[in-house]
């Protein structure tokens, strides 16, 4: 079990610059309900259900924690980056969500929306408050509506999952965030420890288990959290520019000479010594912030996604690593592209795959739907997308992540409707006809430029200052 900090301690561990918003949201919530003709449903005393002893329970919780509710919120600065900050007080009735909690949460979301700031939530909750019954449960709908308004305004939500994050708090503030971080060992899951099946695998309900299942983006040690959150705030804060410039095309890192034949292009792209996506991303970005998982239970280690910083700009990236891309990879890519589009962040995609995974497991995991979703995410994007093919461009599994009209190629890459070996087999050609088939497919970098598929062949950076020399 992870350490359970109070709300104030969790805030202090993240930042020393915090200005709490006190009182207004409860008054506003009460006035709104009174105006709707339900003045008795304000959560005061024994609450909207008249639950016996509820007032005493809240009084004891307040005396024990020093808080008047299970949520504290206000304006904060983390690493010099402004945000609206929410922190749950688990010591106050298990951090549960009641009507007044909903007032505070809605006020926090509205503050972020109206100020154009990111929202950071430090979540530690057991879910809805039983003593307020359905009135408490409907606070989840309020949070969902407030979250939708925040997204529509173009602001981001970063959640930090503390111990525990369960029930409706996980299903709204946690899982509904754009970026989800968690502290090591935190209990994370929809079902709390007292209501899950007795034979359930306890590892599935941990931060580490959720990371492996593609439900969260990273597990961050407490001492690294302030820097990580500050970097994410810098990356996620919309620039305000209605038309961000495209991501610059990366310099090629591998071969300089163009392949003579189609088969030469295939062999160069498949060479184990050719630079891969990791090398390109390291050379391109000052630092990167990974986004992991499709939020549907899957991950793809052969696809790197996230946001990076380059020369003071934020650029989102989706990079294939030379393996067959899984359905979870395409879903993750679509998630990242849509987030970047919403925040006005340009996108860079690096293509390097023999094709989409096509085994039985991939089919059961929804390969077709996942690829279709990736195509749709790129087609819908209003921010500029830049693509560089750095190795194998294997059919639709590669094309799904390639920008129409803004794709570049390296000298040691190829792009083809199908692998030459597969084409020869489908055409019932002899095995020794594969090389000739590669030529007929016109898959070389220079062929792609001539066909209008690629804009240019990108060369390695010159040793001195100067622009790269495109060919074609």
Model-derived regions, located:
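Flexible beta-alpha connector loops of hexameric P-loop NTPases
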Residues: 93-100, 132-135, 323-328, 360-368
């Amino acid at each position: 079990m992870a350490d359970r900090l109070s709300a104030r301690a969790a805030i202090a561990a993240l930042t020393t610059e915090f200005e709490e918003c006190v009182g207004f949201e409860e008054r506003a919530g009460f006035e709104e309900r009174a105006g709707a003709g339900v003045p008795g449903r304000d959560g005061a005393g024994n609450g909207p259900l008249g639950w016996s002893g509820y007032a005493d329970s809240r009084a004891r919780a307040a005396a024990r924690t020093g808080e008047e509710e299970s949520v504290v919120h206000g304006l904060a600065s983390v690493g010099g980056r402004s945000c609206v900050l929410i922190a749950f007080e688990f010591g106050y009735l298990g951090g549960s969500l009641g009507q007044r909690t909903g007032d505070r949460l809605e006020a926090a979301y509205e503050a972020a929306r109206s100020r154009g700031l990111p929202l950071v939530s430090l979540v530690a909750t057991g879910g809805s408050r039983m003593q307020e019954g359905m009135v408490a449960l409907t606070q989840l709908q309020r949070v969902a509506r407030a979250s939708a308004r925040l997204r529509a305004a173009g602001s981001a939500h970063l959640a930090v999952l503390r111990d525990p994050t369960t029930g409706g708090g996980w299903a709204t503030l946690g899982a509904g965030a754009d970026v989800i971080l968690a502290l090591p060992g935190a209990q994370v899951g929809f079902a709390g420890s007292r209501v899950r099946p007795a034979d359930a695998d306890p590892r599935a309900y941990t931060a580490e288990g959720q990371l492996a299942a593609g439900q969260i983006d990273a597990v961050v040690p407490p001492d690294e959290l302030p820097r990580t959150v500050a970097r994410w705030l810098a990356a996620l804060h919309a620039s305000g520019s209605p038309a961000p410039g495209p991501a610059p095309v990366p310099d090629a890192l591998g071969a300089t000479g163009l392949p003579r034949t189609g088969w030469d292009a295939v062999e160069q792209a498949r060479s184990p010594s050719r630079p891969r996506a990791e090398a390109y991303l390291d050379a391109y970005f000052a630092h990167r912030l990974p986004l992991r998982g499709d939020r549907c239970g899957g991950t793809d280690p052969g696809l790197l996604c996230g946001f990076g910083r380059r020369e003071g700009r934020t650029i989102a990236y989706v990079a294939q690593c030379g393996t067959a891309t899984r359905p979870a990879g395409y879903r993750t890519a679509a998630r990242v592209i849509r987030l970047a589009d919403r925040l006005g962040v340009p996108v860079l995609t690096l293509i390097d795959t023999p094709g989409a995974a096509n085994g039985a497991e991939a089919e059961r995991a929804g390969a077709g739907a996942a690829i279709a979703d990736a195509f749709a995410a790129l087609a819908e994007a209003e921010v500029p997308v830049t693509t560089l093919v750095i190795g194998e461009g294997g059919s639709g599994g590669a094309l799904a992540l390639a920008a129409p009209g803004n794709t570049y190629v390296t000298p040691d890459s190829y792009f083809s409707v199908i692998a030459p070996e597969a084409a020869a087999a489908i055409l019932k050609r002899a095995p020794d006809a594969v090389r000739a088939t590669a030529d007929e497919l016109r898959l070389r970098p220079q062929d792609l430029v001539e066909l209008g598929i690629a804009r240019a062949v990108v060369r390695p950076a010159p040793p001195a200052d100067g622009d790269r020399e495109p060919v074609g």
